[in-house]
Amino acid sequence: MTYARSILVPPGSPGTYHCVSRCVRRAWLCGEDRDSGRSYEHRRQWVEDRIGELAEIFAVAVWGYAVMSNHLHVVVQVIPQAAAAWSTDEVAARWLRLYPRRDQDASVRAEALAGNESRIKELRARLCDLSWFMRCLAEPISRRANREDGCKGHFWEARFK
């Protein structure tokens, strides 16, 4: 029986989780495809770099990860107390590292964001949310892989488990 993610991982509560994301359509995350002879090993670095980047931005500790040929494992500890201790400016700066906009000066955008308390509250919650962490890990990798493979659509099978 499946349970809602909000029941398994209550928002705003600390915990350590083992998350798994699998590729769809027999796509390769990394390794070498024996049928085509094509190597996807460079994608391992994409995943490693993104995990490192997100670990600096989110209120999480990454205890381990494994990048396999068609899936990845991540062991993450969510630390909401860390996000609660961040200043308004720090929350804004972290969010803008995650979602930079090219059409607006970063300092202007950070100032506007820091002045919006309700938005800061929402972003603080997102920066210590397991689902947001996994979303921010998976989405850029799937976009790059789809672009490289010349296809569209899902790269990951359902949501992470």
Regions found by a protein language model. Give the residues of each.
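Short catalytic/metal-binding and nucleic-acid-binding patches
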Residues: 1-161
